[in-house]
Amino acid sequence: STTLSALIEKINCERKLHIVTLEDPIEYRYVSKKSLIHQREVGRDTASFAIGLRSVLRQDPDVILVGELRDKETIAAALTAAETGHLVFATLHTNDSTGAVNRILDSFDEGRQLIRSQLAEVLQAIVCQELLPKVGGKGRVANFEVLIATPALRSLIREGRTHQIASYLTTGKQQGMLTKEEHRKMLKEKGLI
């Protein structure tokens, strides 16, 4: 949530956009700067992420933050929002990029080909992170994995070849991709872990 908050705050400071967040609970209160920000809380302002997302679309946002993709309805609503031109940020509890893609796809029993096509079309990037203990045991440091949605990745998703994402990720350094293993090695070289 700290990483997403930093992304939203960067947009808020640099761009004149309408940002709507859906959170459970609201963890960080934003003050509108260049952007106009509206924050909605599940349980207080809306019954669920899925219902809140459908309502948010009527508010004409440019950017939507979804606190968590918990269920099929929320995932479907987030994909629809992205398809209609909204920049959607969301969290999903998985261990890696391949797991994130598979979790989204596995949420749907029927219409999986449609979901693969939707996801392949709208996905921009996946950033996975885990917190590792720092050397000396004081504090933690984030270890990242970054998967960028290139045409080749979109094809893997569309064709149902998600088992090849991990090996594809290792070849994507030129496009800005990073595996957790590569980043962990960098953290060790810096003496952080």
Question: What are these language model-derived features?
Answer:
Residues 1-193:
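Short, flexible helix-loop junctions that flank or precede catalytic/ligand sites
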